Swiss-Prot record:
GO biological process: one example: translation
InterPro entries in UniProt: Ribosomal_bL19, Ribosomal_bL19_CS, Ribosomal_bL19_sf, Translation_prot_SH3-like_sf
Domain of life of the source: Bacteria
Family stated for the protein in its record: Belongs to the bacterial ribosomal protein bL19 family.
Gene Ontology molecular function: any one: structural constituent of ribosome
Protein name: Large ribosomal subunit protein bL19
Record Gene3D superfamilies: 2.30.30.790
Taxonomic source organism: Streptococcus pyogenes serotype M49 (strain NZ131)
GO cellular component, one term: cytosolic large ribosomal subunit
Sorted UniProt keywords: Ribonucleoprotein, Ribosomal protein
SUPFAM superfamilies, A to Z: Translation proteins SH3-like domain
Any Pfam family the entry gives: Ribosomal_L19
């Protein structure tokens, strides 16, 4: 990578990002702007994918809200996310958990591991 681009992106990286992987349940505190007000909206769900590297790394969180699956994708190093809390660590054998989209109820559960 170009040294100039690398030096610019190093200043943008966040240092408070916890260690989480697909299968983990996280609580994302996202800043939402409504008109002139800004508030924190909490989005809690299972991390189904993590892709990219460096400043452009992204992760997708899936939750069930009102019986409907909702997915949101966040950049890891964005200032729009106040904090990321890891609630529990899940035991999975895949890097991408897109198969959870087709499962419902107890079939969509992920076994918890203690780390």
């Amino acid at each position: 990578m170009n040294p100039l681009i690398q030096s610019l992106t190093e200043g943008q990286l966040r240092s408070d990002v916890p260690n989480f992987r697909p299968g983990d349940t996280v609580r994302v505190h996202a800043k939402v702007v409504e008109g002139t007000r800004e508030r924190i909206q909490i989005f809690e769900g299972v991390v189904i994918s993590r892709k990219g590297q460096g400043i452009s790394e992204m992760y997708t969180v899936r939750k069930i809200s009102g019986g409907i699956g909702v997915e949101r994708t966040f950049p890891i190093h964005t200032p729009r996310v106040d904090k990321i809390e890891v609630i529990r660590h899940g035991k999975v054998r895949r890097a991408k958990l897109y198969y959870l989209r087709a499962l419902q109820g107890k079939a969509a559960r992920i076994k918890e591991i203690r780390r």
